[in-house]
């Protein structure tokens, strides 16, 4: 597994733990369709949340959440539609971004998490 894949998996696990601590239940990880992948699918009492996890080593190239481009948003929407067609739910769908920074060796330090609800 490459360095970015390892860091990405670590980031998704950190985001899942954060969401669980906020009262969400993780119902799916790395859901794939022909349009793309959704990192996490979580739910709370009211919402079924499609979560894009973003992390960066520094802010020199912008904030992590700024990398969720319009093209990426469209891929996430299409992938969420595939999920919803195959999973019956009465909950309102929502798209969130969980963003934070992580450098090599920082994986053991508590990092501030930004949870952007209804991001797009």
Feature locations, PLM:
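Domain-level recognition of nuclease-like catalytic cores that cleave nucleotide substrates
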Residues: 86-120
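Conserved catalytic cores of phosphodiester-cleaving nucleases, focusing on short active-site segments
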Residues: 40-59, 76
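Hydrophobic "anchor" residues on beta-strands that sit immediately upstream
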Residues: 25, 48, 92
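Acidic-basic catalytic patches of nuclease active cores, encompassing PD-(D/E)XK
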Residues: 1-29
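Mg2+/Mn2+-dependent nuclease catalytic core
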Residues: 57-85
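Residue-level signal for inorganic ion chemistry
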Residues: 19, 76, 95
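Short acidic/glycine-enriched loop/turn segments that link adjacent beta-strands
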Residues: 34-36
């Amino acid at each position: 597994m490459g360095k970015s894949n390892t860091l990405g998996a670590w980031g998704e696990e950190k985001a899942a733990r954060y969401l669980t601590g906020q009262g969400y239940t993780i119902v799916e990880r790395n859901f794939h369709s022909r349009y793309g992948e959704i990192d996490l699918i979580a739910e709370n009492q009211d919402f079924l949340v499609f979560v894009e996890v973003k992390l960066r080593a520094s802010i020199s190239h912008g904030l992590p959440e700024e990398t969720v481009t319009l093209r990426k948003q469209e891929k996430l929407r299409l992938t969420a539609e595939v999920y919803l067609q195959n999973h019956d739910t009465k909950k309102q769908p929502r798209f969130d971004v969980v963003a934070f920074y992580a450098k090599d060796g920082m994986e053991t330090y508590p990092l501030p998490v930004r949870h952007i609800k209804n991001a797009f």
